[in-house]
Amino acid sequence: MTAKNTICLWFDGTALEAAQFYAATFPDSAVGAVFHAPADYPMGKQGDVLTVEFTVAGIPCIGLNGGPIFPHTEAFSFQIATDDQAETDRLWHALIDHGGQPSACGWCRDKWGLNWQITPRALIDALASPDREAARRVFEAMMGMTKIEIAGVEAALRG
């Protein structure tokens, strides 16, 4: 990987599977080099996939198969800005329908425990509205949503 700054994500032996799923799901994503362990190590054997270089929505990452010691938490998430409800729905359901779990305010967790914010640009723009009362209504509407519904955001923005 030639990027100066790369996000390292810890997996329990499933880095390649996760990277392949992300590459198939998110635009501007791909799997790069796969490195196999040259010798046995505490959480694996010689020849096991040790690291996987991949890109998620243009962000360079490396998946490290380090074992079950450090699970993912909400302290780290990918925020994916979507252009419309169809894209929001597609990405949300790709994550949820393949073993993930929904959460609040557009957040969800994939089957590997990694957290995602599937966030329509319409929500981002509405929350930044110079009309702070409208932004408050949008915020309150968002707080009641699981997956973000743009129609609900727009209705709250209008009042």
Report each predicted region and the residues it spans.
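Short loop/turn microsegments at loop-to-beta-strand junctions
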Residues: 6, 49-50, 103-105
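Acidic/histidine-enriched, glycine/proline-rich intrinsically disordered or flexible terminal extensions
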Residues: 134-159
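Gly/Ser-enriched beta-turn/beta-hairpin loop segments
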Residues: 45, 69-70
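Vicinal oxygen chelate
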Residues: 11, 15, 25, 56-60, ...
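Residues that flank catalytic or metal-binding motifs in active/ligand-binding sites
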Residues: 3, 48-50, 74
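Core segments of cupin and vicinal oxygen chelate
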Residues: 9-58
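Active-site-proximal beta-strand/loop segments in catalytic clefts of secreted hydrolases
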Residues: 64-66
